[in-house]
Amino acid sequence: MIQPQSYLNVADNSGARKLMCIRVLGSSNRKYAHIGDMVIAVVKETVPNMPLKKSEIVRAVIVRTRKGLKRDNGMVLRFDDNAAVVINQEGNPRGTRVFGPVARELRDLNFTKIVSLAPEVL
């Protein structure tokens, strides 16, 4: 469960290392984001000499959460960290690589480019 003020690791090579969620996109009173939800975030930590700079406002999609994701078959999927991939306005990732596993539910939510770049889909 990601809410405003939550810190996220960045799971791509866009240049950001840490993001802080400032808004969960969806309805006006939405409190939490789960895997596959879009958030607006601010870049808190960056890699030197990359296009994304500190304090830049970006859109991101959540790809991993520590809170369990319950599937229809009863399996609960939990990850070790909260992570997101920085995306542009069209929903395509701004980086060219995705690090770490991502959930299969992203494919159903039309984030196929992120799923194809990921090394492991759970």
UniProtKB/Swiss-Prot annotation:
* A GO term, aspect molecular function: structural constituent of ribosome
Name it: Large ribosomal subunit protein uL14c
Q: Where in the cell is it found?
A: Plastid, Chloroplast
List cellular component terms (GO): chloroplast; cytosolic large ribosomal subunit
Superkingdom per UniProt: Eukaryota
| Entry-linked Pfam families | Ribosomal_L14 (PF00238)
- Relate the protein's function as given in its record: Binds to 23S rRNA.
Q: Which HAMAP family match?
A: Ribosomal_uL14
**Predominant localisation class:** plastid
Question: What is the protein's quaternary organization?
Answer: Part of the 50S ribosomal subunit.
What family does the Swiss-Prot or TrEMBL record give for this protein? Belongs to the universal ribosomal protein uL14 family.
Q: GO annotations under biological process?
A: translation
Instruction: List UniProt keywords, sorted A-Z.
Output: Chloroplast, Plastid, Ribonucleoprotein, Ribosomal protein, RNA-binding, rRNA-binding
